[in-house]
UniProtKB/Swiss-Prot annotation:
Its EC number is 2.6.1.37. The gene is phnW. Keywords: Aminotransferase, Pyridoxal phosphate, Pyruvate, Transferase. It comes from Salmonella dublin (strain CT_02021853). Pfam families: Aminotran_5 (PF00266). It catalyses: (2-aminoethyl)phosphonate + pyruvate = phosphonoacetaldehyde + L-alanine. This is 2-aminoethylphosphonate--pyruvate transaminase. Involved in phosphonate degradation.
Length: 367
């Protein structure tokens, strides 16, 4: 391990501000009102307000990574007679399928392939053919490829068919404007270390209270019981059932302040979009091609085809970039040789320009 700090060009954990890091220098007592009422309850309220201005929603914080919250929702929201349609076009949709299988939850997996956007007409046909489906679950920003999925159109279907709608917005909430009530979302799942630009340690669920109240006694897990976590926070003014990740929570509270100072989600989205467009233009000028067509891209992360030169090795390319202070992501696409570059976190236009210069220097196979 080196003491040198790198610019993380990843979908999270990501580069955070100095002030977010400094917020973790304070030690909090998990029983103290200053922490539970003054910090946790404020975060819950702010998250709900970021998600929608409509009444009837609440926020629940849960220890662990984003996948813990996804599993908590699936394991708590679906009863023994329920069935979920899981829309999958990448590793994170596939992870939901795996979770449902391990928990014994009835499910229909619609997998449209990693480089295709889900076909809304195909989803319509599945719902029409199988009235036993009670829930729909899908990923918004699929970071396997950088695909942005059509949660608005699928939400319209969920509303029309009367289905409970679960959206994994891990790498989009806080970075892409949305109104979850208008999108007919019943459960939105995200994480502290993504677009709000906090650090890892907890995830959160923003849910329709009426749906959440119906989850009592359903959970397949003690620790991941979403209803029990919600009731504990409601009844005890922000207290967590089990040990709260206090330092991460303080960092997140600071990150929310910095999101507001930047101008809110709309301003952050604009920065992310400009970062991504500048990155793609610069990479194409260097001879790299994107895995996806431009209209399919999210402003979060972009997958690029690896060079076909026989001398190219991702490990060597990565090492040379890291020496210059930049960390990128390996590929996760099963059918294509790719690498990925994220552009969220404390990343600005000057950073993208510096990255492109570093990439040019690191292209040893062209020398």
């Amino acid at each position: 391990m080196t003491s040198r700090n790198y610019l993380l060009l990843t979908p999270g954990p990501l580069t955070t501000s100095r002030t977010v890091k400094e917020a973790m220098l304070f030690d909090s007592c998990t029983w103290d009102d200053d922490y539970n009422i003054g910090v946790v309850e404020q975060i819950r309220q702010q998250l709900t307000e970021l998600a929608t201005a409509s009444e009837g929603y609440t926020s629940v914080l849960l220890q662990g990574s984003g996948s813990y919250a996804v599993e908590a929702v699936l394991g708590s929201a679906l009863g023994p007679q329920d069935k979920v349609l899981i829309v999958s076009n990448g590793a994170y949709g596939a992870r939901m399928v795996e979770m449902a299988g391990l928990m014994g939850i009835a499910h229909h997996a619609y997998d449209c392939g990693e480089v295709a956007r889900p076909d809304v007409q195909a989803i319509d046909a599945i719902l029409n053919a199988d009235p036993t489906i009670s829930h729909i679950a899908m990923v918004h920003s699929e970071t396997t490829t950088g695909m942005l999925n059509p949660i608005d159109e699928v939400g319209t279907l969920a509303h029309r068919y009367g289905k409970t709608y679960i959206v994994d917005a891990m790498s989009s909430f806080g970075g892409i404007p949305m109104d979850i009530a208008a999108l007919h979302i019943d459960y939105l799942i995200s994480s502290a270390n993504k677009c709000i630009q906090g650090v890892p340690g907890f995830a959160f669920v923003i849910a329709r209270e009426q749906k959440l109240a119906a989850c009592k006694g359903r959970s397949r897990s003690l620790s991941l019981d979403l209803y029990a976590q919600w009731r504990c926070m409601e009844d005890n003014h922000g207290k967590w059932r089990f040990t709260s990740p206090t330092h991460t929570v303080l960092a997140f509270a600071q990150a929310l302040k910095e999101l507001a100072k930047e101008g809110g989600v709309a301003a952050r989205h604009q920065r992310y979009q400009q970062n991504q467009r500048s990155l793609v233009a610069g990479m194409r000028a260097l001879g790299f091609n994107t895995l996806l067509d431009d209209e399919l891209h999210s402003p979060i992360i972009t997958a690029f085809y690896s060079p076909e030169d026989p001398q190219y090795r991702f490990s060597e390319f990565y090492r040379r970039l890291k020496e210059q202070g930049f960390v990128i992501y390996p590929g996760k696409v099963s059918q294509s040789d790719c690498f990925r570059i994220g552009n969220i976190g404390e990343v600005y236009a000057a950073d993208i320009t510096a990255l492109l210069t570093a990439i040019r220097t690191a292209m040893y196979w062209t020398k």
